[in-house]
Amino acid sequence: MFARSALGRSDQLVTALNSQKRQFVLTAATTALGSLLFSEDNRLASQMEKGLLHNKNAENSASIPNTANKFFSRPEAEYPGHVPLYTFEKMLMFLGSSVGAYTHPERNEFIVALGESTAITPVLRRLQHQMLSDPVGRQILRERPRMTSTSLDLEHLRELPDNTIGKTYVKWLDKEGVSPDTRVEVKYIDNEELAYIYQRYRECHDFYHAITGLPIIIEGEISVKVFEYMNIGIPMSGLGALFAPLRLKKSQKERLYNIYYPWAFKSGLNSKPLINVYWENILEEDIDEFRKTMGIEQPPDLRNLRKEYFKKLKEAKKIV
């Protein structure tokens, strides 16, 4: 019993010593921290009294650029209608319009957004250099023509001889039920001249349909896009050539891969640069001579091929 009592007192003594030790360490740490704080306060107070602190901070603040404001400030518009975008906004527009254009290719707003979000500066600079290296291209950049039903005078074009470029163009417009007035203004490309170059490409698209005779149905659009990509190099046209056929039926893919892709590759590569064609000045020229001069072969009539296919399909069903 005596041993247990002695052992208990010993444990109490150890506990008390440990408690005192912890209290001592805590007190010492608090004292040291307080000393550092007071020392820092004293040092700052001394600098303030000598007039050193404020001068130093003023110099530092004047020398540090306001990078935060620069990063978050939106650039000013470079031309009427221009909408400057941050890089992450352009990426979001690209992703959203890519999905939209694939799932709903009939919706023009997705096609427009995808086209501008992929019209990267190096591609447009290459087209700019191509135009500046050609006398007609330089004339286009200098005069900045715009294509509308008024500027093209569609009524006059309807009176031209059948084999002229102008008559071929307006007949294609009437047959497909489209108008040059439907082309949307470019607004997301940051440089004013590059924006015009892309606008010019966009407005000339219907001429590429007209001179090749390809309709605005999905197969015709894809074929023209491949032709454009091989000649002009607009990225969206290449994306369309890769992904648009994935949604098509087997018969449509076969026509594209066996007939129209080979034609588009050959004609697009062999043709002179389409971006340098001043269409407004050659509307009364012979279209066959134009195709020959440019190096463009006319593809088989897509609508006739489709009619023949459906006719054979119908006859096969009757036989079965």
Curated annotation (Swiss-Prot):
**Keyword hit for Protease:** no
Positions contributing to Zn(2+) binding: 205-206, 209, 221
- BP terms from Gene Ontology: ubiquinone biosynthetic process
HAMAP family in the record: Coq4 (MF_03111)
Q: How does it assemble?
A: Component of a multi-subunit COQ enzyme complex, composed of at least COQ3, COQ4, COQ5, COQ6, COQ7 and COQ9.
Could you say which protein family the record assigns here? Belongs to the COQ4 family.
Provide the topology term for how it sits in the membrane: Peripheral membrane protein
Any idea what job this protein has?
Lyase that catalyzes the C1-decarboxylation of 4-hydroxy-3-methoxy-5-(all-trans-polyprenyl)benzoic acid into 2-methoxy-6-(all-trans-polyprenyl)phenol during ubiquinone biosynthesis.
Instruction: List its EC numbers.
Output: 4.1.1.130
State its location(s): Mitochondrion inner membrane
Question: Keywords in UniProt for this one?
Answer: Lyase, Membrane, Metal-binding, Mitochondrion, Mitochondrion inner membrane, Transit peptide, Ubiquinone biosynthesis, Zinc
Cofactor(s) needed by this chain: Zn(2+)
Its domain of life reads: Eukaryota
User: What is the protein's major site of localization?
Assistant: mitochondrion
The reaction(s) catalysed by this protein are: a 4-hydroxy-3-methoxy-5-(all-trans-polyprenyl)benzoate + H(+) = a 2-methoxy-6-(all-trans-polyprenyl)phenol + CO2
Q: Does the keyword rRNA-binding apply?
A: no
The protein here is known as Ubiquinone biosynthesis protein COQ4, mitochondrial
In the UniProt record, the transit peptide is located at 1-31
What's any one GO cellular component for it?
Answer: extrinsic component of mitochondrial inner membrane
Write out the pathway annotation from the protein's UniProt entry: Cofactor biosynthesis; ubiquinone biosynthesis
